[in-house]
């Protein structure tokens, strides 16, 4: 009887070891709020409505197990302002939540646009909305309790790091913290993250040079260094244009490290070449036993229909493979032109 029980336990162990678990992660670029976007969302009753922005993309967002975006503004309260120091209506966050996002990276060069009040109010509202912020913190205790961010989904444990190159020269007011790309700090955070025993470690980095379509030497060097330190995948933002994706072979396992140097803008009022097209990237991670691999990496483009191109006077994200019936002929021309330029 004991022998039979031992065999059964052994079989159960093997079945458990061979069980496949998957998680899909969707990443988008800069969720921006220029003045034209704020003005277009204003309603007759002085409230703001952003639902139109995500109407055509929310199904894709909600299909992912986790959806992550770079929240490149603040919720610092009135007066609402766009560039150069952003503060957006609270309704913008509500629309992001309703669209299906789960995690917002908040460490970027606009984190301190409304100083301490803006940083802390942004975190409070993100928490209240049931979303998760990563990259900025009220104080050291807040950071210690929340960072590195560890999320478990479908039996897969994922740790997230998040840091920025700077904050546009605005000094951090103590005790607030904005994670930086300092290598000593990054190395320490990687050690803490690895001690959590995640199945994958992903770094969300605000880095690179604005409007440059190729990664800088600094980005290339930092990516290699981070992978050497134990980071599995890197997702980049800041340049406001799309940069290449690299697949770097793992040195020990039959898998790859994904390095997305820049996703570009997701939604903004930028009309510069390459500034109105963003990249949406989906990583599928598969865990078998104690090994997790990158099962697939897919990407597609989205185009921002600005208010001046729209029949409704509103902003809207349009997937590259979608031609809405209410898209104006000129809007269709501009969308086609932008996508063709991006694919060159």
Go through each PLM region and give its residues:
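Hydrophobic h-region of N-terminal signal peptides that target proteins for export
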Residues: 5, 9-17
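Acidic, metal/ion-coordinating pockets
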Residues: 19-344
């Amino acid at each position: 009887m004991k022998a039979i029980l031992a065999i059964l336990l052994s079989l159960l162990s093997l079945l458990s070891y061979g069980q496949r678990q998957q998680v899909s992660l969707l990443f988008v670029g800069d969720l921006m709020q220029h003045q034209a976007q704020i003005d277009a969302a204003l309603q007759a009753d002085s409230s703001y409505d952003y639902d139109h922005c995500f109407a055509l993309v929310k199904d894709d967002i909600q299909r992912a197990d986790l959806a992550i975006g770079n929240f490149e503004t603040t919720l610092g309260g009135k007066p609402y302002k766009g560039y150069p120091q952003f503060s957006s209506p609270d309704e913008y966050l509500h629309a992001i939540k309703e669209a299906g996002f789960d995690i917002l990276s908040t460490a970027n060069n606009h984190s301190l646009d409304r100083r301490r009040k803006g940083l802390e109010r942004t975190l409070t509202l993100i928490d209240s909305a049931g979303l998760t912020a990563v990259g900025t913190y009220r104080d050291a205790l807040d950071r210690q309790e929340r960072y590195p961010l560890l999320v478990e989904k479908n039996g897969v444990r994922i740790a997230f790091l998040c840091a920025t190159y700077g904050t546009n020269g605005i000094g951090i007011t103590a005790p607030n913290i904005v994670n930086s790309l300092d290598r000593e700090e990054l190395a320490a955070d990687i050690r803490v993250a690895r001690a959590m025993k995640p199945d994958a470690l992903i770094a969300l980095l605000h880095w690179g040079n604005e409007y440059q379509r190729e990664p800088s030497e600094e980005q290339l060097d930092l990516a290699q260094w981070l992978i050497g330190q134990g980071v599995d995948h890197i997702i980049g933002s800041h340049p406001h244009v799309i940069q290449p994706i690299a697949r770097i072979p793992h040195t020990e396992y039959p898998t790859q490290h994904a390095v997305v140097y820049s996703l570009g803008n997701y939604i903004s009022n930028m009309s510069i070449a390459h500034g109105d097209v963003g990249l949406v990237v989906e990583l599928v991670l598969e865990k078998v036993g104690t090994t997790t691999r990158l099962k697939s990496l897919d990407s597609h483009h989205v185009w921002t229909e600005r208010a001046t191109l729209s029949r409704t006077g509103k902003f809207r994200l349009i997937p590259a493979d979608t031609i809405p019936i209410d898209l104006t002929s000129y809007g269709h021309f501009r969308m086609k032109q932008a996508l063709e330029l991006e694919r060159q």
